[in-house]
Amino acid sequence: MCIRDRRETSHIVGAYTMTQEDIVSGAHFEDAIAQGAYYMDIHTPDNKGLAPMIQPPTYQIPYRCLIPQQVEGLLVAGRCVSATHEALSAIRVIPIAGTMGQAAGTAAAMAARQGISVRDVEIAKLQEQLRADGVMLGEDDRA
């Protein structure tokens, strides 16, 4: 028996919604918590093929995609982040989803230690901790 993987699920409406334009333009964000270079991997609606795959430049995923607009005390990562169908097809892959999860866990720990909301985590300190833990957030992080 073959179990097909699920490429997409429900998404939050976040403080920011990542879009196709963010992927193809190589968007960079002040609140970046992950980076990717995976192409948009979209099957055609009739499931008879793939949409054209074009290698994008390196792009970043902003922390705001992990923060639901109307729910306090919650961060999300992986396929349920705030992203369009097209953008999700690029950021749903394991390395990027795992890095988003690491960022969410790190931010949650920082918020708990400081007694603040996850919305109020200082981005520079979150990025500093992620880099200390080996997360590459952009070209400046490459050796």
Question: Which stretches of residues belong to each language-model region?
Answer:
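Flavin (FAD/FMN)-binding glycine-rich loop and adjacent Rossmann-like elements that form
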Residues: R4-A143
